[in-house]
């Protein structure tokens, strides 16, 4: 029975991933995955970018925003839930996480304990998967397929003050006019409520749509991508994303939102 289950999972993965590049969704899933199967299913649904809470606990990185109550916890490790399944796809597809997808996959980490300690452990845990990473350090660039980012500028400064590392930064609205190098800050994240008071019902006011279009253009001119957060999970939002050329919606309801996007032609 166990062998049959393994075969079934393998067939599901190969079938779903084989068609994923034809239906990629402009989404970043902010749900903390607990198993590698969740990530594979996400890829099969066309959701390729992820955000996860990470904590250093007794020599390993775990996917959690909070310290567990017991040493006998069942929390997933970052390697099991994200790094290994992504690398599995990378190797199986000859250096591509999804065949034909030209861009980096983003893994955004929220660091919930000492940033330097987490980074040192992450560097150790990434060693078997190092060829998959995209980064630029002191002028040396590696073009892999996975870009690991964090949001906290002070955390990144602390990490890089010890030794320049492979992490990139997610910017925010205040960074749009700073023109930070896209190799350092490839993604700008904007709170939906900062750019419109529209709640996703009816039509978005034209002046708000124009403002959003101009913002997207300004970000794209810098060779960066833009994601919106804290927006309703409605089809009207999917329509706005497609018409305004927003790159991503970051949401804990990525599976629901995926159903609102048409299959890419």
Name what the model sees in each region.
Residues 1-23:
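Bacterial Sec-dependent N-terminal signal peptides
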């Amino acid at each position: 029975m166990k062998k049959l289950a393994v075969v079934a999972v393998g067939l599901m993965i190969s079938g779903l991933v084989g068609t994923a590049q034809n239906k990629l969704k402009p989404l970043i899933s902010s749900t903390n995955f607990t198993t590698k199967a969740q990530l594979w299913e996400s890829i099969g649904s066309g959701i390729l970018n992820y955000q996860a809470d990470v904590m250093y606990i007794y020599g390993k990185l775990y996917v959690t925003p909070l310290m567990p109550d017991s040493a006998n916890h069942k929390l997933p490790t970052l390697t099991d839930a994200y790094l290994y399944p992504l690398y599995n796809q990378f190797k199986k597809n000859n250096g591509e996480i999804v065949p034909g997808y030209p861009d980096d996959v983003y893994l955004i980490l929220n660091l919930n304990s000492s940033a330097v300690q987490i980074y040192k452990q992450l560097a150790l845990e990434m060693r078997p998967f190092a060829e998959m990473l995209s980064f630029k350090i002191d002028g040396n660039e590696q073009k892999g397929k996975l870009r690991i980012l964090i949001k906290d500028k002070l955390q990144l400064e602390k990490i890089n003050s010890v030794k320049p590392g492979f992490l990139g930064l997610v910017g925010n609205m205040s960074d749009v006019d700073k023109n930070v190098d896209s190799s350092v800050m490839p993604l700008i994240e904007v709170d939906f409520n900062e750019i419109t008071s529209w709640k996703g019902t009816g039509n978005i006011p034209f002046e708000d749509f124009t403002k959003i279009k101009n913002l997207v253009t300004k970000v794209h001119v810098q060779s960066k991508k833009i994601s919106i957060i804290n927006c309703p999970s409605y089809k009207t939002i999917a329509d706005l994303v497609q018409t305004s050329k927003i790159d991503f919606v970051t949401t804990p309801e990525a599976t629901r939102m995926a159903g609102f996007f048409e299959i890419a032609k």
